[in-house]
Amino acid sequence: MRRLGASLAVLILAPLLGGAAAPGMTPPDLEAEGWRKATWSGIRPAEFSRTASRGVRIRAEGQGSFIARPLSGPAGCLAWRWRVDAGPPATDLGRRGGDDRAIAVSVGFAGFSPSAGFVLRTQHAMAQASAGERPLPRSALSYVWGGTGREAAGQAHGFFQSPWTPGITNLRVLRPADAPRGQWVEERVDLSADWRAAFGSAEVPPITELVISVDVEDTNARVDAQVENIRLVPCR
């Protein structure tokens, strides 16, 4: 996986985030619900399709790409359910190269992490000036089905920095690659608590965007997965 953490709104920020991305062909039924597809340069795009239950099905074989849609408001709790019927073997998501995964559900935020330095902020400001009125996410949390599950060893909060977008994206493995397949799994995450844990700041910025991605370019594995009913919910 080369460029997880880049979102559709950050296409112009691609050099900053670790690679070039470009708009892809979005299926009309997904586009009608606000999704936009994008592809990574040099990687064959995966297939995203709408399911009868208004979810998203992802199919890939040695491919990778993502879809994104706006999601605005305070960082509350995010819930969804997903399943993987076929996916890649366990890979180390904490290192560059070979870091494949079946699905990642990522959320973009309006604010920088405390660790974002002058260079990163300056590059972002230049990209924002070129992007126009649509705000570009400045940080992201990515929840992954894949990996070994040991990438965040020693971290009590379970997050680790993306090897491709340090300072912008922190990842957390919710389901490792060897998790049971062929069955639905319900998820609920507290975005506010997770942002504080991952980035070390008490002030949590608003959320801006939702991204679903897949990448099996390195292992050339096959993916057949679904995610549905993604929604903001009250935190219990």
Regions found by a protein language model. Give the residues of each.
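Bacterial N-terminal signal peptides
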Residues: S7-G18
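Extracellular carbohydrate-recognition regions
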Residues: G19-G42, F118-Q128
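Short carbohydrate-recognition loop motifs
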Residues: P45-F66
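Extracellular/lumenal carbohydrate-interaction signature centered on repeated Trp-anchored short motifs
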Residues: A68-L78, D178-R181, E203-V204
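Solvent-exposed strand-to-loop "edge" motifs in beta-rich extracellular domains
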Residues: R81-G87, A110-F112, S192
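Extracellular beta-strand ligand-recognition surfaces/modules
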Residues: D100-V105, Q161-L171, P176, R181-A221
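Extracellular/luminal beta-rich ligand-recognition
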Residues: V107-T165
